[in-house]
A protein has these predicted regions:
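Conserved catalytic core of sirtuin-type NAD+-dependent deacylases
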Residues: 1-244
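Short, basic-rich loop-to-helix N-cap that marks the start of a DNA-contacting helix
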Residues: 247
């Protein structure tokens, strides 16, 4: 077994204050693509790049076009949690993982059983009326066409942080607090290039910074442990070993 994975297993065994920070790579193993890596594919079908469509100004100006893309590319109702999601939920159940901080909006961590999940970019599971603030579930968006409207006539907006919008300060402060006090910080499935989210890891004060990503990241040089493998296989395998040892 890879010696870095052996070391990570040891750190997980010994710690009861693990914080996980994840990006799109955590969900690709559930069949949800990282739209940044396939811009060309989307550009064939849409007149604008994803970053433009998923912006606040585009939503306000071209709401129908926004929803055409959103239903087509951002909602994956058949996606199921993978080994990474289940491993983290299990570690939380054992009192080891204190929080999952995610850049993803798919709700798969909660579906796997994690309770303390901080969603930096919001979630597709919730939507709200911009006029009366009534909430609607994901199904409502999927089962309507065009621009979804509330009973009051207001336009419904996904509870997702779009480009040009600020992250929720309360969520950020909570994430900073967890990271600052973490013993082990595991960062996985993210290129660490999207700010301000990527800047959160600068608050870590410990000496067990773990990076799990298939490709190199700008922070590889400051990490205490770097594993260039899929996150599901890595965490899933470790969790299997850990739980069988603990049984």
């Amino acid at each position: 077994m890879n010696e870095n994975i052996v070391k990570l297993e040891k750190w997980i065994k010994e710690s009861d204050n693990i914080v996980f920070f994840g990006g799109a790579g955590v969900s690709t193993e559930s069949g949800i693509p990282d739209f940044r890596s396939v811009d060309g594919l989307y550009n064939r079908k849409y007149d604008y790049p994803p970053e433009t469509i998923l912006s606040h100004s585009f939503f306000m100006r071209n709401t129908e076009e926004f929803y055409r893309f959103y239903r087509d590319k951002m909602l994956y109702k058949d996606a199921k949690p993978n080994k990474a999601h289940y491993a983290l939920a299990e570690l939380e159940k054992q009192g080891k993982c204190k929080a999952v901080i995610t850049q993803n909006i798919d709700g798969l961590h909660q579906a796997a059983g994690s309770k303390e999940v901080l969603e930096l970019h919001g979630t597709v599971k919730k939507n709200y009326c911009m006029k009366c603030h009534k909430f609607y579930g994901e199904e409502y968006i999927m089962n309507t066409s065009g621009v979804p409207k509330c009973d009051c006539g207001g336009i419904i907006k996904p509870y997702v942080v779009l480009y040009e919008e600020s992250l929720d300060n309360d969520v950020i402060e909570k994430a900073v607090d967890y990271i600052r006090h973490a013993d082990v910080l595991i960062i996985a499935g993210t290129s660490l290039t999207v700010y301000p989210a990527a800047g959160l890891i600068d608050y870590y004060r410990g000496n067990k910074l773990v990076l799990i990503n298939k490709s190199v990241t700008p922070k590889d040089n400051i990490a205490d442990l770097v594993i260039h493998e899929p996150v599901g296989e890595t965490l899933g395998g470790i969790c299997l070993l850990y739980t069988s040892d603990a049984a």
